[in-house]
Structures are given as structure tokens and as C-alpha cells.
Design a protein with these regions (language model features):
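A generic structural motif
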Residues: 22-26, 137
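NAD(P)-dependent Rossmann-like dehydrogenase/reductase catalytic/cofactor-binding core
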Residues: 184-245
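Short pre-catalytic strand/loop immediately N-terminal to key active-site residues, enriched for Gly-Thr
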Residues: 147-152, 203-207
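Rossmann-like NAD(P)(H) cofactor-binding subdomain of soluble oxidoreductases
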Residues: 12-19, 27, 33-34, 38-119
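Glycine-rich Rossmann-fold phosphate-binding loop(s) that bind the pyrophosphate
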Residues: 8-9
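Extreme N-terminal starter segment of soluble prokaryotic enzymes
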Residues: 1-4
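Small-residue helix-packing motif on alpha-helices
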Residues: 26, 36, 69, 178-185, ...
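Internal alpha-helical scaffold of NAD(P)-dependent oxidoreductase catalytic cores
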Residues: 42, 93-102, 118-150, 160-199, ...
Length: 245
């Protein structure tokens, strides 16, 4: 199977890296940024035109800006399978843009680069395409109407979580730890906590670590005073508002 990436931005690059070696060929296009050439050189693919992708690709990964859909769709006429990662573009509009094709709406996150991503999907796809997506992480089938809300959580969350890790590591360094040691401790703690959260509810984990009158309790009280929970709620709401214009 040959895959064609129409658009070679950060998210497309993350997915392509996660898929390295899993396709017979990788084709990349861009709008003149040079990213397609860079990705092709990095991953052993080819930088080509959208028309070339339409001729050769078995699966098209649509990763352009949403406003570019009407411009690129005619260049991809006749393609048989399309997976779109365009934010805020509903399945119905995608199906209208690619009549006769199997169209799948996908919202991945950057964890796909290391095959630990979350991918929300809706629409039609062959078992082969679904299996390829599953290589990149945890696939969840959701209603098309839920994509904006899901994106505000799983699509944006890696940045929010990375900010929390960065802040904790900086706090550790400010307290006297070597900065690299502080980062290592926080990153590994985050990874272990993520595994624990697979089998235990977040509230249970929080309570298990928090001894009455202890240092964790003091830290959580400080986070409450500074509005940590409200800040996350505000971040999700702001993300939704931006997506919806």
C-alpha cells in the first residue's frame, strides 16, 4: 500500500514518523514550504504534486489547512480512500468533497510519532486502513458531532501536559536540583503515573498519594488556591471557541 500525505505539517510528520517502514511507499506534498522534501528525505519517501498523489496513492492522508479543502479536493479527484485530519471539517463535507471515496475523519495527537497516540475516528475505512491507524496508538470510534470536544481534550492535551511537566521540572531546578535531573524525574514520574491511570481512577491515585497533613496535601492546596483546575477548564473552553471561530 502506498500512502500520500497532502500537507506535510507537524501532525502529518508525526504520523509519518510513526508509520516509518509500514507502507510500500510514502508520498508527500506541501504548499511550497519545503516540508514535503524534508520529510521525504528523512523517511525515504518522495516529494510530489497533489496530482501525482491522486494517481499513485492507495490512501490519501489529508492534512492541509481546513480553508484549503475546496482548493485541493479537485486535484485529488478519483482517489479511493481518504483519511482527513482537518479540524472542524465535518464528515458530511468531506464526503461531498470526495464523492465515491471511502472517507474517514481522524483526529490524532502527537503521540502517534512514538506509536502512543490517541486517534478519534468516524466514517468509512477498510480493515487495512484501520489496522494501519492502530499501529499509531489507541483508536476510538466517536460520533462526528463530538470531534470538536474530543479535539479540545486529546488533541490539545499533549501541550497542556507538556506545560505541566515543564513547570514541575523548572520548579525542581529552582529548588536546587540539576535541571536535567529535575526533568528526568518529572518525565519518568509522568510516564509511570500514566500507566497507573490506565487501571485506577485519577481521583483514587490522587487520594492514594495525599496523606493528611502531608507535603502532597500542601501542594494540592496551593494548586487549588492558584486555580489549577479552573485553568484547565478555561483552556478547553478557549480551544473550543477558537476552533468554532
Amino acid at each position: 500500500m502506498i500512502i500520500g500525505f497532502v500537507g506535510s505539517g507537524n501532525m502529518a510528520a508525526a504520523m509519518a514518523r510513526g508509520w516509518a517502514g509500514e507502507f510500500e511507499g510514502m508520498l508527500f506534498s506541501d504548499s511550497g514550504s519545503g516540508r514535503a522534501t524534508a520529510l521525504a528525505e528523512e523517511l525515504g519517501g518522495e516529494a510530489v504534486s497533489n496530482a501525482e498523489i491522486a494517481r499513485r496513492a492507495d490512501l490519501v492522508l489529508l492534512a492541509v489547512k481546513p480553508a484549503k479543502l475546496d482548493e485541493v479536493a479537485p486535484e485529488l479527484s478519483g482517489v479511493s480512500q481518504v483519511a482527513s485530519i482537518l479540524a472542524v471539517v465535518p464528515l458530511e463535507r468531506l464526503q461531498a468533497a470526495f464523492p465515491g471515496a471511502e472517507v474517514l475523519r481522524v483526529m490524532p495527537n502527537v503521540g502517534t510519532e512514538v506509536r502512543k497516540g490517541v486517534l478519534c475516528i468516524a466514517g468509512e475505512a477498510s480493515e487495512v486502513v484501520r489496522a494501519k491507524l492502530a499501529l499509531l496508538g489507541h483508536v476510538v470510534e466517536i460520533a462526528d458531532a463530538d470531534f470538536d470536544e474530543a479535539t479540545a481534550i486529546m488533541g490539545c492535551a499533549p501541550a497542556y501536559l507538556a506545560l505541566a511537566v515543564e513547570a514541575l521540572a523548572d520548579a525542581g531546578a529552582a529548588a536546587g536540583l540539576d535541571p536535567e535531573l529535575a526533568r528526568e524525574l518529572v518525565v519518568e514520574t509522568t510516564a509511570g503515573t500514566a500507566e497507573l491511570l490506565r487501571v485506577r481512577h485519577p481521583a483514587d491515585v490522587r487520594k492514594a498519594v495525599t496523606s493528611p497533613g502531608g507535603s502532597t496535601e500542601a501542594g494540592l492546596e496551593a494548586l487549588d488556591r492558584e486555580g489549577a483546575r479552573a485553568a484547565f477548564e478555561a483552556a478547553v473552553e478557549a480551544s473550543l471557541q477558537r476552533m468554532r471561530g
